Amino acid sequence: MEKFFDSEEAPEQEIDVKNYDTLTQTLKELESGELDLLAMPAELLHGKQLQMYNANCEVLGARTPRTPNMILVSENKLQYQPKSAIILSDSKLVRRQLRRARKGLRVLSTKAFIEINEREEKFEDELEKYSWMEKLRLNEEIDGFIIPRVIYSEVEINGRRHSLLPDPHNLGDSHYLAHPYSDLVVIIGRKNFPKSISELFTETEGDTIWKIQDYFLSSMDEKQLETIGVLVRHRKLSTLMTQAEKHRDLTMEQSFHDLEGEVITNEILVEFKIEKISSDGKRTISLHRVVPYSKHEIAMVTAKKDWMKFLERAEMNEIKFLND
């Protein structure tokens, strides 16, 4: 939010910004009128929405994520890593994505690496932990590590970086969906707060991302979220068609053209992907939808029904990775 307040997009009105440590205290001050709006990471609201509603507050909108994806710090791209290369990642989702993308890697959490090597390491914060990983890499004790993009800019790293992006270079290549709520900031206020004011801080795409992720993920516990990859974004039809042509994706191309080849919509499109990967990376359950913006609320309801059917069918076929 600091970058937003320093940008040209920031409202012209004078804004008094305060930092708070606890959601409980902040909600009390929102309810009493001492505060007007609260901006917070959406992931911190997960599982606490009842507390928000009890304070007579609600999510008024959200900011579009700027840096949702992770970075691999290594001299080599993933496909060029040596056999049995050691990659550290504290994200269960990313470890599974890396195993899916490349066989033969030793993808470990920080805890596992410390235990295997019988070390005694303690870190005061995330910056110290990732600085330690960079030292391991420079000493050639590991081949690389995964770091959130937002933290990467704060750590002194001289090595090459490789972004883990959601769009494969070629159809069927490796892709990396972000964690649930990744870099998503929600704006919370009292019920019936003036929309004309809250809209100064929110974005339409951010609102869509929050609405769909909340609908799909709010009933999941923290453990379930650890293995879910998700992507929600607005797309221009021209951009999507260029991508479909590049990948020779006839299904996508035909979806937005009639029998005579004419475009059937000029609306902004909403793209939604969700997937769950087995611990060894060998199996993936995924769902992908692209719909016009005006139909995205109806589409997310039907998409969730389809997603639940996929999971139920996997359980019926004794695919055990659903709860691993």
PLM regions: where:
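Small-molecule-sensing regulatory modules
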Residues: M1-T24, R96, R100-D324
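Short acidic low-complexity segments
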Residues: T22-K28, K77-Y80
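Short beta-strand-centered segments that line the small-molecule binding cleft or hinge
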Residues: T26-N69
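Hydrophobic/proline-rich hinge and linker segments of small-molecule sensing/allosteric domains
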Residues: N56-L78, L177-F193, I197
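Flexible hinge/capping segments at coil-to-helix
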Residues: M70-I87, A101
